Amino acid sequence: MAWSPLFLTLITHCAGSWAQSVLTQPPSVSEAPRQRVTISCSGSSSNIGNNAVNWYQQLPGKAPKLLIYYDDLLPSGVSDRFSGSKSGTSASLAISGLQSEDEADYYCAAWDDSLNG
């Protein structure tokens, strides 16, 4: 049985009602099943550099689900195939042992201090 590439779609996080993009993700990433993929999220000192990063997974037709909180913590019930990390003004979500059900939209999110006031 031949494996077809798994296609994970990523969408850039938009902050606030202004829909101002403050975090940058690649538009998409793909990898074969059972492999590992890393999704990057770049920001600045006012968001990722100074605040916690959360990651969300949105399956087609479903509400977003929290995958990672406070940079690298897994909520109860989330597979340990998912892991988060942060360094400076960048964060990453890694998914190991890719499965077909991982095909989804993935969002990174962090508060941006410049939006205060």
Curated annotation (Swiss-Prot):
Residues 20-117 form the Ig-like domain. Its main location: secreted. InterPro entries: Ig-like_dom, Ig-like_dom_sf, Ig-like_fold, Ig_V-set, IgV_Light_Chain. GO terms for biological process: adaptive immune response; immune response. It is found in: Secreted; Cell membrane. Residues 20-44 are annotated as: Framework-1. Disulfide bonds join C41-C108. Residues 73-108 are annotated as: Framework-3. One of its GO terms (cellular component) is immunoglobulin complex. SMART domains: IGv. Residues 45-52 are annotated as: Complementarity-determining-1. Residues 70-72 are annotated as: Complementarity-determining-2. Residues 1-19 form the signal peptide. Residues 53-69 are annotated as: Framework-2. Keywords: Adaptive immunity, Cell membrane, Disulfide bond, Immunity, Immunoglobulin, Immunoglobulin domain, Membrane, Secreted, Signal. Residues 109-117 are annotated as: Complementarity-determining-3. Immunoglobulins are composed of two identical heavy chains and two identical light chains; disulfide-linked. V region of the variable domain of immunoglobulin light chains that participates in the antigen recognition. Immunoglobulins, also known as antibodies, are membrane-bound or secreted glycoproteins produced by B lymphocytes. In the recognition phase of humoral immunity, the membrane-bound immunoglobulins serve as receptors which, upon binding of a specific antigen, trigger the clonal expansion and differentiation of B lymphocytes into immunoglobulins-secreting plasma cells. This is Immunoglobulin lambda variable 1-36. It comes from Homo sapiens. The lineage of its organism: Eukaryota, Metazoa, Chordata, Craniata, Vertebrata.
